[in-house]
Amino acid sequence: YLNIWICKIQPTTIFGLTIGQVLGIAFPPNGLDHWPKGVSAPTAEQDGVVIDFRAVGSNNPNTVAMPGGTGNLTIKGRTSVHEVGHYLGLRHIWGDGGFLGPNDCAQSDGVDDTPFASAQSSFDCEVTKNSCEQVEAFYNDDPLDLVENFMDYSQESCMNMFTKGQAALMRSVLMGPRA
């Protein structure tokens, strides 16, 4: 039902510049409205989740150098949760601004109960971070960025939750395109 491959993923190089270590890769199913067209797996044989062996298991005391030489990410085994989230249709909570669009508060992950964020949390665990104002969307409350969410790029020790909306979306993908 779900293919998971564990292997050594080489650091990503674009135009001859090494931009950092990728810990996992997964493709969402085709035809989801909140994803750009053409981001699903190129072939059926590539439909699944790929995890770097260094990112497997919470008792695997590994650290991986972060992009730009800004420090290390301590591996706690949450990469597979993040990547399966992509496989089940979830985007990053900042709506992939900077990857698939501008880096600003207008990008959405397509889930109503995740607050907007201007960008990923840069592997930090700053629980008071609030990068976007959106009072009207959240019943006269301006929510903080969800650095605890599995679909952010925070320290793995900080990741511990999906929202109810994210859970509902993953369930609908399991009952629909991934059934």
Q: Model features per residue range: what roles?
A:
Residues 1-124:
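Metzincin-family zinc-dependent endopeptidase catalytic domain
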